[in-house]
Amino acid sequence: MQGKIFILPKDSTNQQFVELSHPLTGRPLRYLLTNDHLLQILQVGDSSKQRSWFVGDHVVSDGYLYVCTPIDLLALVLPIIQELTWSRRKEPNRYVSFEDFIEHFDNMGPHYPRVSEVLSPNLLNTLHRICKVNEPVGSLPKTFQLDESSVVKILLRKAKVAQENLPPSIVTELKKQLAPLDLRTPLPQDLLELSCKWHAASLVCEDLQPEWYNKLAYWQEELAPLHAYTKNLEESRKILVEKEALLNSKKRPQNSDITSSLLKKPNRKQATKKSKYFSGEGMTKISSFFTKK
């Protein structure tokens, strides 16, 4: 049976697929739009093994799970409002209305108008979170301008939550990367905490332009001990590998070259050369055995 198994949040209704551009790469990605959320589709499964699902009396040949999780619209809104309200020098220089924003948003692709139609309140709320707001005056509408400090505060809060909820598998991998060469030396917990913080910030900013990760770099000085430790650890591991290679070369038997040369078979040229010195003097010619008597 053809089909796929999707896991959706509870009470999700009116699901429909939409294709939007990834905010960082521009690559088209498929999302699931519901009545109040835009869901990212994550494919879960082992590609090296062929699996299927039993659903009732049917077999679904596609053995993957497709987990749909709500995404923060900040990733979609941020590059658009930045382009509209900041100069090319990345400096705020004007305000725009919500209608101007929606017009630009809808021109991003054929499925964007459907998203703005369903999630208009969500988009407006996102603008309020990351922008300076000029309230309407008379006939002039409410206008918005991207506020860098608001975005940075949101990203820092997200990074803190991500750090506190890193999967155990990631923490274990970070411990391996920081493990001292001397097993008797304990792993510095302060450096592990810094590594988790750094990794969490990278996860939060992975769908954003690199400049936003760099804007969190006020704590780069805090990361200096981590960078120094990992650099020294890398150099120490390199020296250890070189020492092991040198030790293995010294363990090789000294007469191994002599033994191998004695076991070599003479090549054809050597055999031909030796045959030149063979003499058949005193031997009866083979033709003499065939003479008539």
From Swiss-Prot:
Keywords: Cytoplasm, Nucleus. GO terms for cellular component: cytosol; nucleoplasm; nucleus; ribonuclease H2 complex. Residues 265-276 have a biased composition (Basic residues). InterPro entries: RNase_H2_suB, RNase_H2_suB_wHTH, Rnh202_N. One of its GO terms (biological process) is removal of RNA primer involved in mitotic DNA replication. The keyword Ligase does not apply. Residues 251-278 are annotated as: Disordered. Component of the RNase H2 complex. This is Ribonuclease H2 subunit B. The gene is rnh202.
